[in-house]
Regions:
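N-terminal small-residue-enriched
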Residues: 2-93
Length: 93
């Protein structure tokens, strides 16, 4: 089965949807770094190109993508949730 989302680095705690993912579906992902597989139930619909949470985040917890911190959660985020500008803010500005 082709992956529905990609994880760029083993340290990442979000994946990037390569297809639209429907809420409630078991989404299959693949890590580009080592080829490992991960499956998670999507709690929200995740549009193509957007992020899916691979773990639960507490408010103000850092979010890692590409092996680097890209921002922090502005609210609690459940595993499988849609991760985007509505619940993550860049640490840069």
């Amino acid at each position: 089965m082709k992956p529905q989302f990609l994880v760029h680095d083993k340290k990442d705690d979000v994946g990037v949807a390569v297809v639209d993912i429907t809420a409630g579906e078991k989404a299959a992902g693949s890590c580009l770094e080592d080829g490992s597989k991960v499956t998670i139930e999507a709690k929200d619909s995740i549009p193509l190109g957007h992020k899916i949470a691979l773990k639960a985040f507490k408010k103000d917890e850092n979010v890692t993508k590409y092996g680097v911190i890209i921002g922090h959660a502005t609210q609690a985020i459940t595993a499988g949730a849609h991760v985007h500008v509505h619940n993550v803010k860049s640490n840069r500005w």
